[in-house]
Design a protein with these regions (language model features):
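Extreme N-terminal starter segment of soluble prokaryotic enzymes
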Residues: 1-6
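Gly/Ala-rich beta-loop-alpha elbow adjacent to hydrolase catalytic centers
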Residues: 84-95
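Surface cap/lid and interfacial helix-loop subdomains adjacent to catalytic sites
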Residues: 8-54, 58, 62-79, 99-285
Length: 285
């Protein structure tokens, strides 16, 4: 069997607009380092920004679009079978490519498997213990021919926000956030409000009953945000231990389940099993 190329797409802040590195870095390095010599891993650089967060200042949406183009180029350059792995925003990049394959806009006959760590568009029910779904809502369709493995922690709101989480409203409002392109951000925000296209549109109304529901939603959102924040917080000399914190960045450092393996180790094992028992079958636009 020919060597499998693993293309890794990192999360927000793990790459930058002029990133031409080929060696895998960031959290996903713990996946690729655990693979055997049947695999050759390559980093796919892109802006990896969320507005003012990380270099470049592009909006999440614009950053993802650049990532999609670069990932497709990398898939076309791969000499044989390909597997894709993504973390956080990198999952969104991969999901967009999968959507193009599902729609018939892109052929990818060499794509054999996909692994997604903390997918912001994670569907409900794909990970045991996760009762919610990705904070960014439903992603693009996934072709039936491509096996996908999701890696998620139940307390990571990026991939497992509650169904009516207030954090979804923040995600909706900031998808196009960019101080470099304020006009685009404002225009997209106006369209969102004008058409009431929020994920929570059907769950928000003005009534005393809604107010009681909103109290629960506020408590839930607070817990979700604590899970996202670091495990240790400091402000003006005051240090606080946040026992719930760090869930989004712990996939390489903490056991994910009863096996004692980290999420990255679990994904590496799955990729190796796919390569052993399901040998990959070229990418054409």
């Amino acid at each position: 069997m020919s060597q499998v190329t693993v293309l890794a797409v990192g999360g927000t802040g793990e790459s930058h607009p002029d990133d031409h590195r080929r060696h895998v870095t960031g959290l996903l390095r713990d996946v690729t380092d655990a693979l055997d010599d049947r695999f050759a891993s390559r980093w796919v650089g892109y802006p990896a920004s969320y507005g003012p967060v990380a270099a470049g200042g592009l909006s999440y949406r614009q950053s993802t679009e650049v990532g999609v183009r670069r990932l497709i180029d990398a898939m076309e350059d791969a000499p044989g079978p390909v597997m894709l792995i993504g973390y956080s925003q990198g999952c969104t990049v991969i999901r967009e490519v999968l959507g193009q394959i599902a729609s018939g806009a892109l052929r990818a006959d060499n794509l054999s498997a996909v692994g997604l760590v903390s997918d912001p568009e994670q569907p409900a029910g794909v990970v045991p213990g996760c009762r919610g779904r990705g904070v960014a809502g439903d992603g693009a369709p996934i072709p039936d021919s491509v096996p996908v493995q999701w890696i998620a922690h139940p307390d990571d709101m990026i991939c497992n926000a509650s169904d009516d989480s207030y954090v979804r409203d923040i995600a909706d409002l900031t998808r196009w956030m960019s101080f470099r392109a304020m006009r685009t951000w404002l225009a997209q925000t106006w369209e969102l409000i004008r058409h009431n296209s929020f994920q929570n549109a059907a769950r928000t109304r003005v009534s005393p009953r809604q107010w009681r529901t909103d109290l629960r939603r506020l408590r839930t959102a607070a817990i979700e945000v604590l899970g996202y924040l670091p495990p240790r917080l400091a402000w003006r000399g005051v240090r606080v231990v946040n026992a719930r914190g760090g869930r989004h960045v712990a996939y390489a450092s903490e056991p994910l389940d009863a096996s004692g393996l980290t999420g990255c180790q679990i994904l590496a094992q799955w990729l190796q099993v796919r390569a052993t028992f399901e040998p990959p079958l070229r990418v054409a636009a």
